[in-house]
Amino acid sequence: MQNKNSMLFRSGKNLLVYGLMFIMLSIAVDWYRKPSEPNAFAQQVFYDLQQQPKVIAQLSHQKPMLLYFWGSWCNYCKFTSPAVQQLMDDKVAVLSVALKSGDPQQVADYLNQENYHFPVINDPDGEISKSWDIQATPTILIIKDGKVVQHTTGLTSYWGLKVRLWLSSLT
């Protein structure tokens, strides 16, 4: 019996150690890939695929919003985009940037095929993403009152984003 308890304790300890190592590695990778926001980005007017104006300062006023850089060619985005869509369905303000994913019609076709309805700014040449120094897709920035308060790169989940949004709303 004592041997079984000892084995359970060691397994739990190993799980905790490996979990903490994973979290620390994830934080280090996010720090390394940290985007840098362009000057006066919050006041810029962007136009989505439907030619509707989008201003980050307005979208992030009083509540955090997601700025989501993705690509139709990105394998990790195929797992992250449904979480972003679910947050959009939950009434979270979302603005996305389709990085080098084709012309506006190709991006619209991809969105229809995948049943995504979040607003998309097309970045066919990568100029917008370059101005943010985006190094990986997906990259998600959480912006509140026109200021970047959190960011993450790579694979993420609905609940991971939900917790980040909640923490951002506390500030």
Regions found by a protein language model. Give the residues of each.
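N-terminal targeting signals for export/organelle localization
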Residues: 1-47, 171
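Short, small/polar residue-rich loop motifs at catalytic or cofactor-binding pockets
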Residues: 40, 63, 135-137
